[in-house]
């Protein structure tokens, strides 16, 4: 039987996600790279890009401008499935060119022998 939202696993994933969020908002590329699965199967759908494989994700991170990357996060939801799979979703506000935009993000996480890794991610903005 699948255990949904074991409190210890959900707490662990929430802490890891907050580490990801801090790295994202401070452009800590090394931490971001370490949190993504290093595999050709990893996928990240961004606002303007579709990235397939860890090489694409790494290249995107390294080329991303470190200016104005902070955002206000809300409605963070972590749902765990047993001790090795989780979905993380949230909404955020971010100012782009003086306009506050509402966005959303979803990630699938999987626990490997080397720890938890993001295996799939999606980021998008709602229409203005």
What residues fall within each predicted segment?
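Short, low-complexity N-terminal intrinsically disordered segments enriched in polar/charged residues
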Residues: 1-35, 128
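Short beta-strand segments enriched in hydrophobic/aromatic residues
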Residues: 36-37, 92-94, 122-125
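Short, solvent-exposed coil/turn segments at beta-strand boundaries
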Residues: 81-84, 112-114
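Beta-strand elements of well-folded, non-transmembrane domains
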Residues: 94-96, 109
């Amino acid at each position: 039987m699948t255990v949904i939202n074991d409190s210890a696993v959900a707490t662990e994933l929430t802490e890891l996600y907050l580490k990801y969020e801090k790295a994202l908002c401070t452009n800590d590329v090394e931490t971001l790279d370490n949190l993504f699965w290093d595999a050709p199967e990893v996928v990240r759908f961004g606002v303007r890009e579709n990235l397939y494989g860890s090489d694409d994700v790494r290249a995107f991170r390294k080329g991303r401008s470190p200016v104005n990357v902070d955002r206000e996060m809300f409605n963070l939801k972590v749902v765990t499935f047993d001790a090795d799979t989780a979905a993380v979703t949230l909404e955020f506000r971010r100012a782009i060119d003086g306009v506050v935009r509402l966005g959303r993000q979803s990630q699938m996480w999987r626990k490997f022998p080397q720890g938890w890794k993001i295996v799939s991610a999606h980021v998008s903005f709602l229409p203005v």
